[in-house]
Each structure stands twice: as C-alpha cells, then as structure tokens.
Amino acid sequence: MTSATSPIILKWDPKSLEIRTLTVERLLEPLVTQVTTLVNTSNKGPSGKKKGRSKKAHVLAASVEQATQNFLEKGEQIAKESQDLKEELVAAVEDVRKQGETMRIASSEFADDPCSSVKRGTMVRAARALLSAVTRLLILADMADVMRLLSHLKIVEEALEAVKNATNEQDLANRFKEFGKEMVKLNYVAARRQQELKDPHCRDEMAAARGALKKNATMLYTASQAFLRHPDVAATRANRDYVFKQVQEAIAGISNAAQATSPTDEAKGHTGIGELAAALNEFDNKIILDPMTFSEARFRPSLEERLESIISGAALMADSSCTRDDRRERIVAECNAVRQALQDLLSEYMNNTGRKEKGDPLNIAIDKMTKKTRDLRRQLRKAVMDHISDSFLETNVPLLVLIEAAKSGNEKEVKEYAQVFREHANKLVEVANLACSISNNEEGVKLVRMAATQIDSLCPQVINAALTLAARPQSKVAQDNMDVFKDQWEKQVRVLTEAVDDITSVDDFLSVSENHILEDVNKCVIALQEGDVDTLDRTAGAIRGRAARVIHIINAEMENYEAGVYTEKVLEATKLLSETVMPRFAEQVEVAIEALSANVPQPFEENEFIDASRLVYDGVRDIRKAVLMIRTPEELEDDSDFEQEDYDVRSRTSVQTEDDQLIAGQSARAIMAQLPQEEKAKIAEQVEIFHQEKSKLDAEVAKWDDSGNDIIVLAKQMCMIMMEMTDFTRGKGPLKNTSDVINAAKKIAEAGSRMDKLARAVADQCPDSACKQDLLAYLQRIALYCHQLNICSKVKAEVQNLGGELIVSGTGVQSTFTTFYEVDCDVIDGGRASQLSTHLPTCAEGAPIGSGSSDSSMLDSATSLIQAAKNLMNAVVLTVKASYVASTKYQKVYGTAAVNSPVVSWKMKAPEKKPLVKREKPEEFQTRVRRGSQKKHISPVQALSEFKAMDSF
C-alpha cells in the first residue's frame, strides 16, 4: 500500500492491451463490428457476377472512418484533462490518427477492387493496427480514470494519517470531519469503478473493501477518542491500532481491485468447496471404472487410500466435543459400511475384468457404493448441524456477561469472562469451518470463511474494549467505545450466522432442532421432578432459543416463495408456535421456577408444565411436516431421520423411564416394516390400487381454486390423512402408533361430517332432482366408509399390570387390526406416583404384539384399512364432481342471483406458483453442462485477438 507521502504508483503495465472494464468493451464493439464486416465483404472469393465497385464496401469504409474520428475527438479531450498520463494519451491519439489514415486509404482501395487478395491483405493489416491503436487509447483513458481514483485514495490516506496524529479530542473531531468528507467522495468514485469492472472477483473485492471502510469508520472515531482520553490504558492503543489497520487494508483493497491486482481467493484460502465434500465428490467419480481397463494393483490402493482419507476427516468430526453419542455411533457405522461397500465393489470389478459391458451385479455394487457415501454425507451433515444448533444458540450471552462485568469495574472477573468469550468466538469459527468442510456451495463457503476470519480478528478487540471499560467504568468515552465494538460484533455474528445458514439445508436444520428440543424437554421434566432450578431455567432458555431460531429461519425461508397454500400452512405453524405455544411454555417455566425457588416449596401442577413442553416439541414437528410437504420422494428419502429416528413423546410426560421403555417396545410402524416380503408385496398391491384412486382425486381437485371452496379443502385434507394411514401399513410415514391411526381416522370422520353438511347445503339448493339424489347417495357412501375406516383402526383392549408383568386381553373386538391403545398406569417411583400415558401394543387376540400375534392377522388388518381408504377416496371424488354439477344446475335455473350467495365458490385454479428463487440442496452445487445456443456472440476482445492471429497476405 502507498504511504501518505509517497507518489501514486500505478500497478498496471501501460503497454498491456488487457481490457478490464465494461465501458472500454462497449466503446470498442461498434468499431470491431464495422471492421469485421468490411473485411468479410469479399471473404467468399471471386464472384461470378460482373465486376465493378462495391457500394457496400465504400459505405462500410466511411463508417469506419467516422468511428475513428469520434475516437480521436474524445481522446484529445481526455488528454487535455489528464494530469498524470498526458504524454501517453497524446501519443496514443496520434497513433490512432496515423493508423486511421492508413486504414482509410487501404479500405478505399479495397472497396474499389474487392476481389484483390493483395488489397484485402493490406486492409486486414491496417485494420489490425487500427484496432490495436484504438484499444490502447481506450485503455489509457481507463488508466486515467484509475489514476483519479488513486488520487482520491491518497487524499483519504493523508486524512487518515491526520486523524491518527490528532493531539486532543477537539483536534480529533475536526480532522475526523474532514476525513468523513473525503470518505464520501472516495465511496462515490469507487462505486462507479466497481460497476465498470469486468472481473467478478475484482467487483467483489471492491465491494468488500468499500464495506470494510464504511464499517470501520465509526469505530475509528470512538477508538481514537478512547485512546486520547485514556492513554494510560494499554487496551485503548490496541483498539485504535486495530481499527487504523482495518481502514488501511480497506484502502489498499480498493486500490488493488481498481487495478485488478487483488490477491486471489486461492491466496487467501477462501476459495473452493469444502475439503470433505470435495473428497467425497472425487471419490464418487473415481469409483466409476471401465472393466476392460480395470487393474486391481492400480486401482485398489488408490481408492482405499482416498476412502481412508475421507474416513479420517469423518472421524475428526465424530470425535468433536459437540457431536452426540448416537450421532458418533452412526458416523462410525456408516464409515464401516462404506469400507465394506468398497470391498464388495472391487470384488465385482475383479469378476468383470476384461468385459466390454458391466454386468448387473457390478451395477448394483456401484449403486450400493454411491448410496453408502450418500448416507455418510447425511450423517456428517447432521453432525455439523448438531454443532451449529448448539454453538449458534444465544450467541450474544457471553458478550453481555463480559460487558456487565466490565461495567462493574471488576478487572479480574472481566479477564475470566474474556476467556469464556474467546472460547465462544473460537467455537463459532470452528463450527463455521466444519460447515464449510461438508458443503458443495462454493460461493457460500467463501462468504462463511470471510465472515469467520472477521470474527477471529474482531474478538481480541472486543475484549480490549471491555478491559478499557473495566479500567474506567465511569468514563462515557469508554462506554461509547464498548457499545461500538459490541454493535460491530453482533452484526458480524449475524453475518456469519446467515452465511452458515445459507450453506446448510433447512431440512437438516429442522430435523436436528426437533431432536435437540426433545432432548431439552426431557431434561426440563427431569430437572422439574428433581427440583433442580438452575438446570430447569438454563434448559428452558435453550428451548426458547431453539424455537426462536426455528421460527426466524423458516420465516426467512418462506420469503423465497410466492404466497400460496404451501407458505400459508408453514407460516400458520410458525405463528402458532410463536404466538400461542411459546408464551404458554414461558409462563409455565416461570410458575415452576417460582414454586421451586420459594423458601417453602409451593405445590404446582406438573402436568401443566409437561403438556406445555410437549406442545413446543409438537409445534416444531408440525413446522417440519409443513415444510416437507413439497419435497420429492427422493428428498424425503434423503431426510431419512424423519422415518427412522424413533422418538416418542408421551401425552402426559416426556420422561423415559425403564418401565416406559419396557412397555413401549417397538412402534407399530416399525413392526409393520418388519413384515415378511410376501406380506409386504400383498400390501404394496393394495397400495397401488389406492394410489390409482388418489390420482383421480388429485386430478379432480387440481382443477379448482380452494379459496372459497371448503369442499375442495376438505377433500385435500382427507386425501392427505388417508395417504398417511396407508403409508403406516408399509412401515413408513408420520404415524408411528396405531393410536395415531385412530386419531387420523377421527380426523377423517370429522372432515367427512363437515363435507356432508356443505354438500347437503348444495343439494338442498339444487333444483335438479336427479343431481340431488346422486349427490345425497355419494354422501351416504362417505358416511359409511368413514365409519368403516374408523372401525378398521380400532380394537378395544384391557391392560393390567400385575407385579410388574403385563397382561393384555382383548374385549369387544371390532376388527383384527392391531393397535397401540393408550392407557394410564401408575408408576411408583420412590413413593411418588406419576401418571404415564403408555402405548401398549395389542392384537385382536389380546396378546402383546411380537409375542404371539400372527402376520396374517396384521396383513388382513392392513389390507382392510387400505380397502376402506380406497373406497372413501372414490366416494370423495364422486362427491366433488356431483357437488360441482349440482352447483351448475342451481346457477342455470336461478341465474346471476345464485352467484351472489353460493354455498361454495367454483373457480378454476390459477397456474401453479413456483419459488422465486430455487433453493438448491448444498450437495447439488456442481458444475452443470448445458447445450449452448447455436448462435454465437463474438465479443470484441475475441474478434481483436483473431485479427492479431491472422497471417499477413
């Protein structure tokens, strides 16, 4: 960087013809086009037509001459105004004039005889020389603009030096005012230059430098003022020197970006996707080999070495302090699975050596290998999200504690809290780098690394500001300095948080947040029962923080979509959590803490607290379900934790006791997933028939706008619930227990009842008796099939717990469908009885599932449920159609009066809305190859280089 007294040095070779700005390119393009057209006039060789003068060539030659004259006039004006490059500009203008005259003569002779290859060659050489001369003139003019910018930078540097040398606060105020004025001028000139730069990297560097200059300007004044007021406090000098260095680096950044000499991202270590992600991508590419050329001695060591390198990186992440034990075990298991898959793949390659085509076993092994690496990626992403969820929670607390200690003037305490704050900052940086390591989003990774670097450099200065305040707690200047550094820290943490959120998946975030909130809810309940106030308060605070972060991120995510049914459902779920659930939870926490903190413990209703905690978990889970509504089956498969993680939240308590786990056993959904393949195949056949009926309903409701049409809304709701019920029979979906299936059946019955009322109102107003009778008949079917579905989902059971031994007997069996029936049982724990609502697996015969229930009984139950759902789906389709037909009859008879007060509004649905911004999954940020347009646009620079490359004639 230039000092305040050194002359301006341009880091740009004046002889270089590299075009660096869009303006030069735009100005050069018309001349290049005209010259190219002129040269190509007779490019096709001699013509069979009568020879003569080419009028078109003469016109083109005249246009080239006029364009050259325009460049000469502008160049002379720039040369007169320039102070630094006057001689070079004058020489360039004369060169353009000379080459322009040569071009005029050559083009005129060529126009008179366009078939002469000699004259054409002479004109091509003249055109090449003219273009080079004009390009050099424009580049020199561009250099003159850069010199003006550098002059502004020099003035700002001098003003900065003056601020640094201020001797008192009044002198500082005056000098800083002048510095501010020069800053405004520099920012204007730099912004113009930024818009003109061709290189995106240089534009980014210029924007970053301008932002840094603006960001540090406020800190510059307060840090300098604190140093002048308290020169005896060493921390004030450290603050001031840091800010001055930041401003100087920003000025140097503007200078380098303006001259296109900025250090590359590679030099700064900010470029590229994450190391672990890149290694996995490369490994996935390397496993695709040609059996004809496969050699075990060549490929086995290479692939095994690559895989072990990946596993080493995964092991480091697994061993990190914030990685949960269960996540660590899953990572280890996936690493072992990947190792085994590679050995299987290599064995298949050996079996296929020398073959032209890959056999089916080899293709299966490749698919398995790819799936295992994908599974490993998922576990690594979840591990990173564990870290993010914990570390980016209540990020301002360590800072606030540090500031409070500083305000009290307790320097010893400040040093202790400074260590905590430093560890917190280091953790943020570490976690941010972990997030980068597994991300494929190159631009996002760059932003995260830059933000993390800023956090790393700012942390010591925040501590210095706190030390200054601790040494002079009564000083307003020290307080102002602390406030400025506090604001800057909070802004930088927000930048880092948003950058990290951009390179991580919302689905992963919701999955991990849901699990963490469940952990915290369990901790809260245990702390409540043990009377541990501190743990209760701290954990409840973590729950509030996690919920607030879920709400913030999901609201921000929905801004990427146009308003519609999807966004309404998601925002409705977030609103319920923020406005209803969380206030109730906070109230119950306050009541519990007050009761436990009293000198004489006050009685309070534990179940109220437990229910409030349960609602928080349910609220987050509902948000996640709403967000996943538009995901594809492939995306949902990738989010397998939604299906596999078997977290149960009991209706009365979330505490998992040994008795609880003994009673719960496996979920009914898990048991359905363990059926024999023959039974699964039969269920799949029934599900396929059900899907055919579903497609009919989808086609019918897709026609209509559901705003103002509750019949369509109810049909969609019933369809969604029936899909969940059929998924349950395959061991999938959100319904875990058959108590969930019972509740789903109740919801369908309620929706069917509401649809019955609406459709009957339509039927009552229908003047056509035939249509009316059809509609009423279909409504009877809905009532019948709703009742049938309800029966298929229930079985009554009586459960007794005698001497710790479960005895289950079926009574009043209405169906053979297996169920988890909720009962309340007293669990005696230390003389204290607590009500636990427990899910008990039972079958029609009354025996516990897994200890005697027959697979055939479960198959019959599943097929009965699917059949009932299919029949109900068909009835809903017919009801929707009949309701529309009845409404049209009503309108035909009564005319426009009917439109004023319809029971439901039948309007065709508008075209489906798409996201304004496609949020790609991080792993999809790979290079895509697309077929280009057949029509090519040749840039002026390319055309110029082609002229340079042409041989002389």
UniProtKB/Swiss-Prot annotation:
<dbReference type="GO" id="GO:0099092">
    <property type="term" value="C:postsynaptic density, intracellular component"/>
</dbReference>
<dbReference type="GO" id="GO:0016323">
    <property type="term" value="C:basolateral plasma membrane"/>
</dbReference>
<dbReference type="GO" id="GO:0034316">
    <property type="term" value="P:negative regulation of Arp2/3 complex-mediated actin nucleation"/>
</dbReference>
<dbReference type="GO" id="GO:0045296">
    <property type="term" value="F:cadherin binding"/>
</dbReference>
<comment type="subunit">
    <text>Interacts with CDH1 and CDH2. Interacts with ZNF639; recruits CTNNA2 to the nucleus. Interacts with F-actin.</text>
</comment>
<feature type="modified residue" description="Phosphoserine">
    <location>
        <position position="651"/>
    </location>
</feature>
<keyword id="KW-0217">Developmental protein</keyword>
<keyword id="KW-0965">Cell junction</keyword>
<dbReference type="GO" id="GO:0030027">
    <property type="term" value="C:lamellipodium"/>
</dbReference>
<keyword id="KW-0597">Phosphoprotein</keyword>
<dbReference type="GO" id="GO:0010975">
    <property type="term" value="P:regulation of neuron projection development"/>
</dbReference>
<keyword id="KW-0225">Disease variant</keyword>
<keyword id="KW-0539">Nucleus</keyword>
<keyword id="KW-0963">Cytoplasm</keyword>
<dbReference type="GO" id="GO:0030424">
    <property type="term" value="C:axon"/>
</dbReference>
<keyword id="KW-0130">Cell adhesion</keyword>
<dbReference type="GO" id="GO:0021942">
    <property type="term" value="P:radial glia guided migration of Purkinje cell"/>
</dbReference>
<dbReference type="InterPro" id="IPR001033">
    <property type="entry name" value="Alpha_catenin"/>
</dbReference>
<dbReference type="GO" id="GO:0005634">
    <property type="term" value="C:nucleus"/>
</dbReference>
<dbReference type="GO" id="GO:0005200">
    <property type="term" value="F:structural constituent of cytoskeleton"/>
</dbReference>
<dbReference type="GO" id="GO:0098888">
    <property type="term" value="C:extrinsic component of presynaptic membrane"/>
</dbReference>
<dbReference type="GO" id="GO:0016342">
    <property type="term" value="C:catenin complex"/>
</dbReference>
<dbReference type="GO" id="GO:0098885">
    <property type="term" value="P:modification of postsynaptic actin cytoskeleton"/>
</dbReference>
<dbReference type="GO" id="GO:0005737">
    <property type="term" value="C:cytoplasm"/>
</dbReference>
<dbReference type="GO" id="GO:0005829">
    <property type="term" value="C:cytosol"/>
</dbReference>
<feature type="region of interest" description="Disordered">
    <location>
        <begin position="912"/>
        <end position="939"/>
    </location>
</feature>
<dbReference type="GO" id="GO:0051823">
    <property type="term" value="P:regulation of synapse structural plasticity"/>
</dbReference>
<dbReference type="GO" id="GO:0042802">
    <property type="term" value="F:identical protein binding"/>
</dbReference>
<dbReference type="GO" id="GO:0051015">
    <property type="term" value="F:actin filament binding"/>
</dbReference>
<dbReference type="GO" id="GO:0005912">
    <property type="term" value="C:adherens junction"/>
</dbReference>
<feature type="modified residue" description="Phosphothreonine">
    <location>
        <position position="632"/>
    </location>
</feature>
<dbReference type="Pfam" id="PF01044">
    <property type="entry name" value="Vinculin"/>
</dbReference>
<feature type="modified residue" description="Phosphoserine">
    <location>
        <position position="939"/>
    </location>
</feature>
<keyword id="KW-0451">Lissencephaly</keyword>
<dbReference type="InterPro" id="IPR036723">
    <property type="entry name" value="Alpha-catenin/vinculin-like_sf"/>
</dbReference>
<dbReference type="GO" id="GO:0015629">
    <property type="term" value="C:actin cytoskeleton"/>
</dbReference>
<dbReference type="GO" id="GO:0007409">
    <property type="term" value="P:axonogenesis"/>
</dbReference>
<dbReference type="GO" id="GO:0048854">
    <property type="term" value="P:brain morphogenesis"/>
</dbReference>
<keyword id="KW-0472">Membrane</keyword>
<comment type="similarity">
    <text>Belongs to the vinculin/alpha-catenin family.</text>
</comment>
<dbReference type="GO" id="GO:0016477">
    <property type="term" value="P:cell migration"/>
</dbReference>
<dbReference type="GO" id="GO:0098686">
    <property type="term" value="C:hippocampal mossy fiber to CA3 synapse"/>
</dbReference>
